[in-house]
């Protein structure tokens, strides 16, 4: 037995309904196992396109049905997202639009593009130095550069030599003064001893006489 499919067109309401005869499962050829073969699909397609009026109506109905189903599905999904609160998370937050700046001597973000000589304070000498010259000034001021390190080393050697000579000269002066004092103290002692010895010898001779 064959089944009859009725194709309804909303535009042609009240008119005769178009009917297309589709073979039933019993009428299928043996070996098809209930599934349509490519030849059957092609034959049905050829049967439909023989009558251009029926073909146009079927295509229009199919197109309208697909559009309605897609629209209804979108509406239902949007309604469900709105109920569950997932619509806001899906859309995301609206980013703030930054207006472009048209002021003179400024970029589009409003930052000034005018050249300014920035100055920095030296932590060693507390002088205001231009930012361009701050690094070499700090290098020379702290004695960290090549030339400045040599100068600092030279200063250290000179200061160490001067300190050593000053301490050595003081010790030499102290030694010389000590020697002079000792020589002065020792000379009268020798003379007194000699005089005492001479006197004692003379006294002994006089006594012997």
Swiss-Prot record:
Entries under InterPro entries matching the protein: SAGA_su_Sgf11 (IPR013246), SGF11 (IPR051078)
An example molecular function term from Gene Ontology annotations: transcription coactivator activity
UniProtKB keywords: Activator, Chromatin regulator, Cytoplasm, Metal-binding, mRNA transport, Nucleus, Protein transport, Transcription, Transcription regulation, Translocation, Transport, Zinc, Zinc-finger
The encoding gene: Sgf11-1
Organism: Drosophila willistoni
Entry's free-text remark on domains: The long N-terminal helix forms part of the 'assembly lobe' of the SAGA deubiquitination module. The C-terminal SGF11-type zinc-finger domain together with the C-terminal catalytic domain of not/nonstop forms the 'catalytic lobe' of the SAGA deubiquitination module.
Record's protein name: SAGA-associated factor 11 homolog 1
Comp. bias regions, Low complexity: 156-166
Pfam families per record: Sgf11 (PF08209)
């Amino acid at each position: 037995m064959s089944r009859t499919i009725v194709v309804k067109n909303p535009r042609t309401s009240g008119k005769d309904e178009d009917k297309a005869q589709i073979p039933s499962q019993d009428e299928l050829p043996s070996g098809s196992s209930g599934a349509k073969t490519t030849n059957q699909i092609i034959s049905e397609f050829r049967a439909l396109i023989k009558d251009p009026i029926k073909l146009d109506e079927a295509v229009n109905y199919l197109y309208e049905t697909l559009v309605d189903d897609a629209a209804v599905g979108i509406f239902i999904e949007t309604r469900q997202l709105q109920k569950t609160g997932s619509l806001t998370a899906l859309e995301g937050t609206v980013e703030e639009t930054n207006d472009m700046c048209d002021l003179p001597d400024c970029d589009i973000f409003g930052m000034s593009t005018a050249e300014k000589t920035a100055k920095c304070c030296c932590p060693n000498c507390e002088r205001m130095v231009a930012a361009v010259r701050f690094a070499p000034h700090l290098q020379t001021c702290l004695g960290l550069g090549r030339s400045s390190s040599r100068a600092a080393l030279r200063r250290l050697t000179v200061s160490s030599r001067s300190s050593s000579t000053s301490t050595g000269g003081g010790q030499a002066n102290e030694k010389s003064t000590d020697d002079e004092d000792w020589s002065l103290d020792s000379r009268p002692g020798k003379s007194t001893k000699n005089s005492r010895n001479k006197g004692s010898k003379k006294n002994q001779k006089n006594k012997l006489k």
